[in-house]
């Protein structure tokens, strides 16, 4: 899909196609449509990022809370969005052994309690084996810093999903 | 459900229950969770309304664009959220005659083109027969005024859905 095609979309098509580049936040794609025309992938994603950066703190936390728990029990596989399911499958998180999975689940619960949002990680950019280590590291970060880190992961995921939709190299 | 139950919810439960009181905008419920505890229905809805009012123009348009077209062909029935389907059914819009439906569809298309968002109406507060007349009237309003009117309808729908969930009289 080239950028002329994107610029020709009405808001219904645009939200259908881009509504989940920020997980479960079609509102953001629907808002970004106001900023068309777009000159390319970089310009398009700039508007997604600017919208997130312009949200109040509660809204930024809200974006994170729309993400599924990684390898979590709360969101059964069937309820993951297609994008998340592909990304989690590719990362091999469903292949964690029972003990590793239990430990990972304990740490994600601690993370959720500490920060008030789920652990978000751009899995396609990570070594699967590194996810538990990264989780343990981020669990110890100060909340304001961790919010910035987590939103950075949301933006990486957004970039990858947009590049995928536009058929470009990330 | 009483307000103590609401205040005891973790963000996952809260978004599951309240994620669609603003149509297809779980981000807003996820943000409102940051404002707990809530003293009651009025306090809870105040935070939903304040979040919408605090959005930039593109975000307010985005909220509207997440709503389905009334009696529309773009969103087939199966894709409506459960809440929208109930509200549209109750309003009898699916019972429009062929000619009325065609006329209604033409006007909603004009509305969409003029304002860049779909026609939103709190159907449960309207006489079904009045919807086409109200659409024709609002189609002639200045865009800034119509945005305010449409967001007012979003808030009425939010109020009705919240009252329904809390088991209170709207």
Curated annotation (Swiss-Prot), chains A, B:
Catalytic activity: 5-hydroxy-2-oxo-4-ureido-2,5-dihydro-1H-imidazole-5-carboxylate + H(+) = (S)-allantoin + CO2
GO molecular function: 2-oxo-4-hydroxy-4-carboxy-5-ureidoimidazoline decarboxylase activity
The protein's role, per its UniProt record: Catalyzes the stereoselective decarboxylation of 2-oxo-4-hydroxy-4-carboxy-5-ureidoimidazoline (OHCU) to (S)-allantoin.
Native species: Bos taurus (Bovine)
Pathway participation: Purine metabolism; urate degradation; (S)-allantoin from urate: step 3/3
UniProt cross-references to Gene3D superfamilies, sorted A to Z: Oxo-4-hydroxy-4-carboxy-5-ureidoimidazoline decarboxylase
Name of the molecule in the record: 2-oxo-4-hydroxy-4-carboxy-5-ureidoimidazoline decarboxylase
Catalytic residues identified in the record: 67
Gene Ontology biological process: allantoin metabolic process; purine nucleobase metabolic process; urate catabolic process
Enzyme class: lyase
SUPFAM superfamilies found in the cross-reference section: UraD-Like (SSF158694)
Subcellular location: Peroxisome
GO CC term, one of those recorded: peroxisome
EC numbers on record: 4.1.1.97
Alphabetically ordered keywords of this record: Decarboxylase, Lyase, Peroxisome, Purine metabolism
